[in-house]
UniProtKB/Swiss-Prot annotation:
Catalytic activity: 2 H2O2 = O2 + 2 H2O
Name by which UniProt lists this protein: Catalase-3
Gene Ontology cellular component annotations, sorted alphabetically: apoplast; chloroplast; chloroplast envelope; chloroplast stroma; cytosol; cytosolic ribosome; mitochondrion; nucleus
Taxonomic source organism: Arabidopsis thaliana
InterPro entries referenced in this protein's UniProt entry, alphabetically: Catalase, Catalase_clade1/3, Catalase_core, Catalase_haem_BS, Catalase_immune_responsive, Catalase_sf
Name of the gene: CAT3
Obligatory cofactor(s): heme
Length: 492
């Protein structure tokens, strides 16, 4: 018998119950005892194995994006951008690439309602012919912080109080009162789009600035945007309470039901590009993840479409064990010097090794679908079949070679080692622009939400004043409305 034929898969299920080792089990409802009412015997191997397996079913929860659901489909290029990038999966219109997408909430735990006011994750894994490309984004184009060293703190502030295990806005507002750069993200999170109706009716963004490299070697900064073809729909605060009270998995069910009925969710992919030579022409730093790029100056360019036409086969295997990492890029797409992106390149791989083990990229849902080869051997839960005798490089006995050099940005740097804040902060302009772009009733809902959280009893007069000052600098009328309703004078 070929021992590799019956690899772990439900496709090879026996017609009868067995142990993990394959031995037949004749009774799966009674423990082995001495007599009818005697003590249970330790020699009941099946009992011990069954219970031990059960008590180890849960793996560490994601520290963020714990609540999520995945679906599979394809990405198809619809517009030629081969002049902008040499990425193989973007080489020509009509090219299709298999994908898996994970949608999630960010802050709350694995079993939390999907109606919480929170950022949503929008992560896409492209299984390309040149390896996996993970575009790990959100439904907001910006984030609260611009430097990865602050990431543990912002998550700690957003997460529940470590003493009470209750999420409390006095903690969040205390921490972020030190971060005026967070204002633009609040203009998404506390706007109407802060509670999407479901995952099908929300936008997605790559958030960070990446780089595209053309065959000629020309480099462009790029931002990625996903636009749902069925439009954007949100829940009001009142609707969210009703929907979440009736079904805490409403968005998961909506996604599953839509795909099962043939109503496949679809998004269009657009990009914005910028010549690095032009980065000093703006009143903000293009690598600052707390800022958006103005679309009137850097217009959206269509690239392709994302279609989800298959539900997952198993939640644990294809959602819980699905692992994303912004460090996974392919030739033609590279990182930028965005400080938060640089940190995520390490942090995401590190958290997956903690959750799933050092060989998490061998799991079927994470493994590349193209041929691959390296000498990363052994480690916990390594199940890759290998029969090589050479596990080092170079060798006269192994003909493997390094691949041809792929194009990457050739930046040159000068300067001293330093820890500093970027010079072009400009923390208030874009937040004010977004607020003023809304209709009056939408502005009123935003103000109402801020009045509510700024009324937290444990929030100090000083912190309230700081926030009113921030919003006043973004838009004078907004600050005045908050000050009037809270009976607080702004202070800096």
């Amino acid at each position: 018998m070929d021992p590799y034929k019956y690899r772990p898969s439900s496709a090879y299920n026996a017609p009868f119950y067995t142990t993990n080792g394959g031995a037949p089990v004749s009774n799966n409802i009674s423990s082995l005892t001495i007599g009818e009412r005697g003590p249970v015997l330790l020699e009941d191997y099946h009992l011990i194995e069954k219970v031990a397996n059960f008590t180890r079913e849960r793996i560490p929860e994601r520290v963020v994006h714990a609540r999520g659901i995945s679906a599979k489909g394809f990405f198809e290029v619809t517009h030629d951008i081969s002049n902008l990038t040499c990425a193989d999966f973007l080489r020509a219109p009509g090219v299709q690439t298999p994908v898996i997408v994970r949608f999630s909430t960010v802050v709350h735990e694995r079993a939390s309602p999907e109606t919480m006011r929170d950022i949503r994750g929008f992560a896409v894994k492209f299984y390309t012919r040149e390896g996996n490309f993970d575009l790990v984004g959100n439904n907001t184009p910006v984030f609260f912080i611009r430097d990865g060293i602050q990431f543990p703190d912002v998550v700690h502030a957003l997460k529940p109080n470590p003493k009470t295990n209750i999420q409390e806005y006095w903690r969040i507002l205390d921490y972020m009162s030190h971060l005026p750069e967070s204002l633009l993200t609040w203009c998404w999170m506390f706007d109407d789009v802060g509670i999407p109706q479901d995952y099908r009716h929300m936008e997605g963004f790559g958030v960070h600035t990446y780089t595209l490299i053309a065959k000629s070697g020309k480099v462009l900064f790029v931002k990625f945007h996903w636009k749902p073809t069925c439009g954007i729909k949100n829940l009001t605060d009142e609707e969210a309470k009703v929907v979440g009270g009736a079904n805490h998995s409403h968005a998961t069910k909506d996604l599953h039901d839509a795909i099962a009925s043939g109503n496949y969710p679809e998004w269009k992919l657009f990009i914005q590009t910028m010549d690095p030579a032009d980065e000093d022409k703006f009143d903000f730093d293009p690598l600052d993840v707390t800022k958006i790029w103005p679309e009137d100056i850097l217009p959206l360019q269509p690239v392709g479409r994302l279609v989800l036409n298959r539900t997952i086969d198993n939640f644990f295997n294809e959602t819980e064990q699905l692992a994303f990492n912004p460090g996974l890029v392919v030739p033609g797409i590279y990182y930028s010097d965005d400080k938060l992106l640089q940190c995520r390149i390490f942090a995401y791989g590190d958290t997956q090794r903690h959750r799933l083990g050092p060989n998490y990229l061998q799991l079927p849902v994470n493994a590349p679908k193209c041929a691959h080869h390296n000498n990363h051997h052994e480690g916990f839960m390594n199940f890759m079949h290998r029969d090589e005798e050479i596990n080092y490089y170079p060798s006269k006995f192994d003909p493997v070679r390094c691949a041809e050099k792929v194009p990457t940005p050739t930046n040159s740097y000068t300067g001293i080692r330093t820890k500093c804040v970027i010079k072009k902060e400009n923390n208030f302009k874009q937040a004010g622009d977004r607020y003023r772009s809304w209709a009056p009733d939408r502005q009123d809902r935003f103000v109402k939400r801020w009045v509510e959280i700024l009324s937290e009893p444990r929030l100090t007069h000083e912190i309230r004043g700081i926030w009113i000052s921030y919003w006043s600098q973004a838009d004078r009328s907004l600050g005045q409305k908050l000050a009037s309703r809270l009976n607080v004078r702004p202070s800096i």
